[in-house]
Amino acid sequence: MFDRPLKILFVSSEVVPFAKTGGLADVAGSLPKALATVVDHGLSHHDVRVAMPRYKMIEDARYVTDFPVWFADKNHEAIIRQREIEAQFQGARHTVPVYMIDNYQYYYRDGIYVFDDEAERFGFFCKAVLEMLPRLGWQPDVIHCNDWQCGPIPLFLKTHYRGDPFFSRMATVFTIHNLQYQGNFPKEVLHMLGLGKEYFRPEALEFYGSVSFMKAGIQYADVLTTVSRTYAREIQTPEYGQRMEGVLRQRAHELYGIVNGINYHEFDPKTDPRLHRNYDVDHWEHKKENKFTLQREMNLPVRDVPVLGLITRLVDQKGLDLIAEIIDELMRLDIQMVILGKGDKYYEDMFREMKVQHPGKIAAHIGFNVVLAQRIYAGSDMFLMPSRFEPCGLGQLISLRYGTIPIVRETGGLADTVNEYDLATGGGNGFVFKEYDARALYSAIARALKLYREDQEAWGRLVRNAMEMDFSWARSAVEYLQVYRDAMEKVSEERGIRIA
């Protein structure tokens, strides 16, 4: 069924390279390109387009059309502008159109979030995206909605547009990137959305006294996804469910976990221009030259000792309290640590103080620097991710690509992508600990250091295992295309419509 190229609209509140506050933008800038170019079931060249708001910082977007959108009891102007993102396929260049919803009142501001009228800004955005489609004369098979900002789209399709034949064949997929951010608003928002009080109930949009845009997506989308199989299971439990576990359990049979990918052209140690010495899986030993360069750059003694890298947002989620608990014990070992990140002042000050207390052992750059990040990925021997929770995780995917061995807690996407190295079989690609406990983290680090120091041949196998993993966007795209077909089939069966 559906043995033809698909028409896919990917909707996100932020998209690289136009607007970014977090990892969602990276996904929205990468996955559509992979979807447009991947060969799947012998098919390629799916018609993939992207929709996002046109924020103040986005320049040179060309005019396409404009129209009024009835929203919050009055007409608002929606201007559609367009940019493109480029994708490469078999040596040819392809473009993915990016439609930008422009409205001066809602989007001509400094920054993307967080404003007092978020419900109105993104409620309008979702309505305008749907109103745009008949103006373009384009009917996507699937609308892929991302996070709470896009939650009203499935809701609107099953309420305001339910009887409209233009929209009747469209399936929706809703992806939860981080359940912690839910878009919860006062119940008066229902009127703004054009919905009656009958939607203020637990079976619909009510969420502990609020109206939840995240819950709108979860309840009304045809199929749900999140960014790893383990996180899909975790969010159905009270520990990780952010009070949404009940509604997620009800839809467990339609909830898929698909690990995000990384751009294998951008993150390639063989060609990365930011590295002192390029290398590949057959010449991984050249990593050492990058280590020595990193040590010089970070004012650490240039010695062939294990270097542990840490690149992260400095927030509670990332397990930094575990590192703090064992740092003095770690520093008694013959190792070095290189830290890059910014975030909460408490953790920024903590790492500054560690650097002072352990000169020549710890280097910390508070802030973010893309070039330095790549040099840490390439120059470190091991990479720490002791996260409290991690829906998917990006750092471990990049570190694997660069042959830098991840030491991670078994949660979310970390559990799906990193497996404990087995000396007997030679399998595995990292070191893993289960309990959120500083001693468990220390034990995992100790296992990594023991192998590194005592068996370089085995360490070489481990590095090669890591570098040979495939976490490219092409792999993720194939999985998403199957989910899209599942959503289309569900719509076809439920509505009695044949979708060719």
Swiss-Prot record:
Binding of ADP-alpha-D-glucose, residues: 20
Entries under CDD domains matching the protein: GT5_Glycogen_synthase_DULL1-like (cd03791)
Tree of life domain: Bacteria
Involved pathway(s): Glycan biosynthesis; glycogen biosynthesis
MF annotations from Gene Ontology: alpha-1,4-glucan glucosyltransferase (ADP-glucose donor) activity; alpha-1,4-glucan glucosyltransferase (UDP-glucose donor) activity
Keyword Transferase: yes
InterPro entries xrefs: Glyco_trans_1, GS/SS, Starch_synth_cat_dom
Enzyme Commission designation: 2.4.1.21
PANTHER family listed in its UniProt record: ALPHA AMYLASE DOMAIN-CONTAINING PROTEIN, GRANULE-BOUND STARCH SYNTHASE 1, CHLOROPLASTIC/AMYLOPLASTIC
Entry protein name: Glycogen synthase
